Amino acid sequence: KSVRVHHVSLQGYLEGNPSNKTRLSQLKEAVNACVSRYQNAGRTVRLQGQWPDYLVGSREDIYYGENRRIRYTTVIAYVLNPADCSLMENISRTADLVSGGGTCNVDLASKTAKGYCPTDGHASSPANTNRRGPAFGDDEGLKQLARDPRMAAAVASIQKTIASSNATSGQKRSVLGLECEVWDQPAAPGGGSACYTKKGSFVPSRVTGQGAEVGMLLDFDSKYGFKMKAVSAKLDNNVSPAVFAPYNMPGFTVSARMATEK
């Protein structure tokens, strides 16, 4: 039986501080210096042809169900290959499954998964569509930390940041023809914003219990962090239930669920 989802594909890059442009220029200088040294020493080099636009690029595919969400992330980072002065790709492929039942973190490259990873891919987790999550200040872990006078100020700062990140800016934009609501993201590196659409037959809500924004992410912009923009968005699309449980594939090792991870 298929599962009804909203599916968005986003592409972007890490701006960073120093900026992507500055760090890319620094890498080019390091490559040129490496080539010069190796050629003078008579060593073999592999000259770089086309250069990437971004030092760290990312692609995300997010599938929103009515009671769960899974995000597939691929990150490609370019570094100097000391063997021949070429560029080397460091690629990570991960997925995180989240619902009211807990979180499962999946490393697609090493075929490992940890956390709350039931075989049904959180299909039986309680639905909380269109419901605002519990206030962050109700978190028991924070309450315990706040009892320590040395941590009280830090906890208050965390609560203030999270509370402000839950506030909409009141602005609206259009991405891929879909109207979305802009939310401030002060906790993002350097601050930022995210735009969520509430279009479709259901409105997915953030299910971590740490945020009130609802909808499908179409745009995320952080001053020093990642800048992601939707390149494809499909509402009310039917997919296989296997999308929510990649760790059920042969060869995966799933760790025992820890109570603290639920």
Label each residue range with its predicted role.
Residues 1-262:
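Extended soluble regions of mature proteins
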